[in-house]
Regions:
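Flexible "stalk/tail and boundary" regions
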Residues: 1-6, 12-13, 22-83, 87-88, ...
Length: 137
């Protein structure tokens, strides 16, 4: 299980280091192989490869005549990019993924059980505050 919020830094090449507390699990369950894709909230979703493959199988079986399904398939499968942790626990994010999520130097990695969300740090704080305000209303 992946849980918790961690501030992370992207280096000049677009690599982000996965926090050490998650690395052993990712090496065990996925041999350090991950898949990143986009989310409607303009963040990235990062799954261990075996979990992503199960999601992808389900996505491609959905009825493609449904407009919402096609949009979801185009975004999630279309942007899906395999990542591999290097010896330092870093993964290289493509320029397209970084631009989609507005990732520059500082980011937030949010554990979501079976996956991570990777957010532009300012966008994360804004959305978090909006969600908290919604709960108060």
């Amino acid at each position: 299980m992946f849980r918790g919020a961690t501030k992370v830094t992207l280096d000049a090449k677009g690599r982000v280091a996965i926090p050490s507390r998650y690395r052993d699990r990712l090496l065990t369950v996925a041999a350090g192989r991950l898949v990143a894709t986009v989310d409607r909230d303009y963040c990235l979703l990062i799954y261990p490869l075996p979990d992503w493959e199960e999601i992808e199988r389900k996505l491609v079986r959905l009825p493609t005549l449904n407009k919402q399904v096609r949009r979801l398939q185009r975004l999630m499968v279309g942007y899906a990019t395999e990542l591999e942790m290097d010896g330092h626990g870093r993964v290289l994010l493509t320029r397209e993924l970084r631009e989609f999520a507005g990732l520059e130097r500082q980011a937030m990695l949010i554990g979501q059980g079976n996956k991570f969300e990777l957010w532009n740090d300012e966008r994360w704080l804004k959305r978090r505050d909006e969600w908290l305000a919604d709960d108060e209303g």
